[in-house]
Every structure is written in structure tokens, then in C-alpha cells.
């Protein structure tokens, strides 16, 4: 089978899902493709360029949310954040991949459409860009914690797994009260907490917009 950029990226994404970002290497990728490692550099000048392409492929494959003509900006913001989160969760270490890569020029048209949606709603271009960046970074940071917790759970010893989180925070009444409801869910990284934080951000944006009118 001929080796081209698309095949390299597809195999790199598959390898990422198997071994994680820390163990993803051009050597392992070359072995997977049945080629010598230098052959990869005909297509990508270094590993960073390869990861940029893998990130773009991940977004193209899973992040299908796009602003629609006449769509309400609040509705879009919620849908977009949820789509980014599900995309990052669909790939092992997806958040770490996105956090360490640069957007490609192929993504600029989508970004322009997002900014136009916010500008049409009444935000300035710089405010619109700030919203887009803030939402993305909130989601990436949240998923970093989600995926990091999964990795920690795999590494925890039996003794650690059996520790009582409420007993550990018992000397701190406010912390105990705040965590009590989450203990029943088994984790602080829940859909409920994600949605609560997202709502706080969106409501803050709405307040800013009302102040401009």
C-alpha cells in the first residue's frame, strides 16, 4: 500500500489510541507502517508537525459542530463546547494532543464562521475571539483532568483505591459539604460539573453583551 500523508496520520491516530501520547514515537509509527523512520520526514519535518496533523485529523473526524445561518449564539456555544469535549474524549490523550499543537490553515474558515456568529450577536471581533479561545481552553483543561483521572485510576494501588475521600477532608467542613454530593457520583469530573462551569461562562458573556446594548 502506498504511503501518503493521510495514511501516516491515520496510523498515527490509531497508534495514539493504543499506546498514548507519551509512548507515541516516529520509530514505532515507522515500524507500524513497515518503513524506515527517515521515510516519515518526507511528509513531516518533525514529530511536532506530525502531531499537528493528527490533531487536525481528530477534529475533522469527530468535531462536526459548525455554526448554522441564523443560529443563536448561546445555543451554538453550548453545542460547540460539548462537541469539543466529546471529540477529545473520543481519542486517548486527546486533550494533551490538542493542548500541544497548532491549528492548521484548514481550520481558519471554521474559526472565521464562529467569530462571525458572535460579531453578528453584538460582540466585537476581539471579544468574539476571546470567547472562542476561553471556551476551547475551558474544555481542554476540563478534559485534561478527566483523562488524567482515568490514567491515575489505572495506576492506583488497591490500598489507594480503598481510601475514603470523605475521611480525608473531614477536618474541613466547607470542603466536606461541597464534595459530599460528588462522592456519590464517584468523581469530581462529571457531566454535571462540566455543564455548571460552562453555564457560568455563558451567563457571564450574556451579562457583557447586555452591557453593550
Predicted regions and their residues:
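Short, Lys/Arg-enriched anionic-surface-contact patches
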Residues: 1-4
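Helix-turn-helix
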Residues: 7, 11, 15-49, 53
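Amphipathic alpha-helical interaction segments
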Residues: 49, 79, 113, 130-137, ...
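Amphipathic alpha-helical segments used for helix-helix packing
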Residues: 55, 85-113, 144-148, 175-180
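Short, basic, alpha-helical segments at the C-terminal edge of helix-turn-helix-like DNA-binding modules
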Residues: 57-61
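Hydrophobic alpha-helical connector segments
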Residues: 64-108, 125-128, 132-135
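Hydrophobic alpha-helical bundle segments that form small-molecule/ligand-binding pockets
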Residues: 110-164, 205-213
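C-terminal peripheral helix-coil segments that are non-catalytic and often amphipathic
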Residues: 148-213
Amino acid at each position: 500500500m502506498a504511503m501518503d500523508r493521510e495514511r501516516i496520520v491515520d496510523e498515527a491516530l490509531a497508534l495514539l489510541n493504543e499506546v498514548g501520547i507519551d509512548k507515541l514515537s516516529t520509530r514505532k509509527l515507522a515500524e507500524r507502517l513497515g518503513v524506515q523512520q527517515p521515510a516519515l520526514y518526507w511528509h513531516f519535518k518533525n514529530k511536532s508537525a506530525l502531531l499537528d496533523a493528527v490533531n487536525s485529523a481528530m477534529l475533522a473526524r469527530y468535531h462536526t459542530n459548525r455554526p448554522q445561518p441564523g443560529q443563536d449564539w448561546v445555543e451554538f456555544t453550548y453545542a460547540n463546547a460539548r462537541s469539543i469535549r466529546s471529540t477529545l474524549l473520543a481519542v486517548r490523550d486527546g486533550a494533551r494532543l490538542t493542548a500541544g499543537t497548532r491549528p492548521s490553515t484548514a481550520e481558519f474558515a471554521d474559526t472565521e464562521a464562529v467569530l462571525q456568529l458572535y460579531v453578528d450577536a453584538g460582540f466585537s471581533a476581539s471579544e468574539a475571539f476571546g470567547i472562542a479561545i476561553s471556551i476551547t481552553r475551558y474544555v481542554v483543561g476540563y478534559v485534561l483532568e478527566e483523562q488524567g483521572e482515568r490514567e491515575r485510576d489505572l495506576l492506583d494501588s488497591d490500598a489507594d483505591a480503598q481510601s475514603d475521600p470523605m475521611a480525608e477532608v473531614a477536618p474541613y467542613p466547607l470542603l466536606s459539604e461541597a464534595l459530599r454530593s460528588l462522592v456519590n457520583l464517584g468523581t469530581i469530573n462529571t457531566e454535571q460539573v462540566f455543564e455548571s462551569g460552562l453555564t457560568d461562562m455563558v451567563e457571564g458573556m450574556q451579562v457583557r453583551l447586555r452591557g453593550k446594548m
